[in-house]
Structures are given as structure tokens and as C-alpha cells.
Amino acid sequence: MFCIQCEQTISTPTTKGCSYTMGMCGKTAEVSDLQDVLIYLLQGVSDYAVKARSVGIVDQAIDAYVCQALFSTLTNVNFDAARIIAFINEAQQNRDSLKSRYEAACLLAGKAPEAATGPAALILTADKAELLAWAPNAAVNRNYKEIGEDILGLRLLCLYGLKGAAAYMEHARVLGQQDDEVGAEFHQIMMFLGTEPTEMQPLIDCAMQIGQMNFKVMALLDKGETETFGHPEPTRVNMKPVAGKAILVSGHDLHDLEKILQQTEGKGINVFTNGEMLPAHAYPAFKKYPHLVGNYGSAWQNQQKEFAAFPGAVVMTSNCIINPNVGKYADRIYTRSIVGWPGVTHIEGDDFSTVIEKALSLDGFPYDEIPHYTMTGFARNALMAAAPAVIDQVKAGNIKHFFLIGGCDGDKQERGYYTEMAKAVPQDSLILTLACGKFKFNDLEFGDINGIPRLLDVGQCNDAYSAIQLALALAEAFECGVNDLPLSLVLSWFEQKAIVILLTLLSLGVKGIRVGPSVPGFLTPNLLNFLNETFDLRPITTVEQDLKDILAA
């Protein structure tokens, strides 16, 4: 086992990355090694997807499969070895399907097909022991002594960024948004990484290409969400329990939330969101369901305590899941899509009757707690509508600075930095936030500036797209570049979606980003120095020092 993809990975002066019997996330060495094999085989599928496209063959089902399977290897998504082996078997079937169709098309065209090499030529059995025996050949650090730590770090930056993009592509596909050009670009990048590149500049270019591609993906996802559910509107959300039977929906998948709401109508069940599902309350399509009563709990790292205390059924629609046996709720949590945990019931299709039956059999909340509200829904449309008023307040000198403080949350004590930073932001500044990092401070009162709330919850992690659109609109209004705006980005990262959002921002030329609570373990001192010199990317220090530097710039 070797895994260094998330922020909680082992990091000491002598050891970088999880490499023992279990990762810090709870992933076993067995699952980690199987995921390495899966990624290697997926690069072979992409190789043949590129070849097939050269003869006019595009298979959207296989395009979707590759993203789904790669998504399953993100942090806190799938811990089930049997499910990973099923993905491995499907990878070889899909590759062989593309191969046979590609070779047949070449034969018809009277040209010789390109020979398969590397991942595209690998044939493995379905036997777990044999897969694990072969796994060292697919380890992400398999030849680091020959290539050096800098090249390995760049390969991993690209791979982990591509994982994040794959997740967003799958979220978009579920909502009917699948773009063949983006799919082609994705396969080309996967194929490139499968060649085990050893040159620094092509890998840097690849990282920027992933960022640019993900900007298109975020636009697709934004389109899918807004065309399906309407544009989010500023909305007040109750954060306290409501009496009655209950289902909790966590993850990111709005499609699943809609199906659950439809199937629970009239059944006396209240539906609560959790974590990154909080922004769902702002979509017009969900406001017609009175039994969507509020949000329960906070960020992913608190689920073992919060889910254990929740007296109903829980549905995990995407990341992040952690060991449900700790809180003894494995018998009432259900996984969806690419999510998996051994022994937990997995739901295929859109029938949530099993979840509903479980919720009805449980006690539910005995009484209403005193409501406590937070605001969400300041996504692209709402921000664009507010932009003229914001611009007027900037010109009047009432708004002097914008802060984007958000990203992934986690359980490290150092993440208290983000709470203190939000508290310390001057009263003449607006704070935009997104993703589960908002839970570090969204229960605080920030007031407003002449009717404009000082805290603006943009939405889920992918709604960084909305924040980017606001920045572009402000830059246009003030006839300057984004980097010339009084805008500071203070981001918290944890997993691969955050990595691809960072690459997206860097590929758009955004500079001066602060990242914490620590820097990614796969980035070497040389790579960090390059990112600092090229993009002014820097780690957080202290609230006092960072705020002083930001406001003095």
C-alpha cells in the first residue's frame, strides 16, 4: 500500500504517505492496492477510447463508466474490495469491447490498428489473490527511485486532479450533461498518464489542461443543476431537529435527494440534508416539498457522532463516508452510486423503499428543537443579480475587500484557523464560502453591509464556478484583471475535488491563493517553490500574519 492523496495522510520528517496495513482514512491496504490496479486498467480503457475515437467510435456508456470507476478511488468513497474488483472486471470488458470495435473499423478502412502496450495490453484474472499479487506493478510510486520525487509529485498532482474532475463529470452526467469533447480530453489525459511520463514540462502542462477541462465540467454541472432544479435563491435553513420520522441525505447528489423527496411524500417522514447537501434547500424545485425540513449535522468528519445520534435512516449519495461501525449505525445507512462500505446495504436504481421502510421502523425525533437558521443560496444567478449593488457599495467605499474562505473541512485542530480568519475579517469586507468548510463558521452572525449579507454561502464545492463568475464580473466592471481585485482566496483542502478546483483556479491565472491547513504531501519542496514563484501560491501561516499581508497588498 502507498497512498498520499488526502490531507490526513501520514506526514512526518521521515515518512510521507500511508503505507502500512491501513490508511488514515480507514482504507485497508487490500482496497488501496486494488484501487491502484483499477486505475492502471482504466488508463488502458482510455487508451482504447482514444484509438476508437480516431475511427469515429464514441461510447458514452464507457465514457461514463471510466469516470464512475475513477470516482470510486477518491478519498472516503468506496472501501468495499468486492465492489472494486467488480470495477476491475468491468474495466477489462470495456477495454476489450473498444479494442474489438476499433480493430474491426481499422480492418474496414484498410489500415493496420495500433498495437496495445502498457495498461491497454494488460490481462488479469478476477481472482483477488492474483490481483493483489500483481498490485505492486500498479502502485502510484512504483518507480519513484528512477524518476525522482518531483516527477512523482507532478504525476500525482495530475492523477489526483483528474480524479476530482471525474467526480464532477459523474455528477454532471447524472443530471443529463455529458460532453463528448470533454470526454475525449479526459481519455487523452488518462492515456498520457498511463505512459508514465518523465518530463517535467509536459506534466505541468497536463496539470493546467486538467484545470481548464474542469472549468468546462463545472459549467456543465452548473447547467445540469440549474436547468433541472432552477437557480438557487438566498434561503434560510433550519439547522435543528424537527419532530417525526426521519431520513438524512448526505453527499452531493441532488438527483437522489429529489427521488427521496418524491417517494416520501405523504408518508409522514421528514427529510434532512447533511454536509454538502445543505445548499439543496436553495433550489426552487425542492421548495415545493414541505417535508424537506432542514439540515442536520455539519461536515463529514463529524458523522460518526452525528449519524449515531440521528434517529432515522441515512443515505450516502457520494463522498464522504467513514466507518459506520464506530457509531453502530451500519444497519441504517445506505450507499448509492460509487459509494461503498463492506456490509452496508447498497441501493441500485432509484427505488428507495428500503430506506423508507427503515425510517418508518425507527423512532425519529420526539420533539422540535428551537430553530437555528443559516443562509445559503448565493450561487451564480443570485450573485450576478447582486453584483450591481455590490459594485455600488465598492465605489462608495463601504465594501473594501472580498474573501473566499472555504473548501474541505476536516478534524485537524489546525483547521480552527478558518474560523478565526472569518471572525477577524474587517467589517467592511464580504466573505464568500462554499463546500463543507463553511461549517467552520456558518453558525456565526456576520451582519450585513447596507443590506448585503457579509457572509455569502455560494454552495457546494463545485459551486466555485459561481465564485469565479462573480470575480470575472467584478473584474469587468472595474476594468481590471481578477488578480487586481481586492479579492483574497483562503482555501482549505482535504481531497481530490479540492485539488482539481485549485488546478482550475491556477489554470485561469488566479494568483495569491493561500492553502491549508497543510500543503499536499505529494508536493515536494521544489514543486512548492515552483507553484509559489509561478502562481504566488502559499501555505497559510497565522491569522494575524496572513490578514496583515492580505490587507497590506
Curated annotation (Swiss-Prot):
Q: Would the keyword NADP be found if you checked this record's keyword annotation?
A: no
GO CC, any one term: cytoplasm
Cofactor names from the entry are: [2Fe-2S] cluster; hybrid [4Fe-2O-2S] cluster
Q: Which domain of life is it from?
A: Bacteria
Q: Name one GO molecular function term.
A: hydroxylamine reductase activity
* Biological processes, Gene Ontology terms: response to hydrogen peroxide
Q: Which InterPro entries match?
A: HCP/CODH (IPR004137), Hydroxylam_reduct (IPR010048), Prismane-like_a/b-sand (IPR016099), Prismane-like_sf (IPR011254), Prismane_a-bundle (IPR016100)
- Places the protein is found: Cytoplasm
For binding [2Fe-2S] cluster, which residues are annotated in this chain's numbering? Answer: C3, C6, C18, C25
* Family label: Belongs to the HCP family.
Query: What's the protein name?
Result: Hydroxylamine reductase
Q: What species is given as this protein's source?
A: Tolumonas auensis (strain DSM 9187 / NBRC 110442 / TA 4)
The primary gene name is: hcp
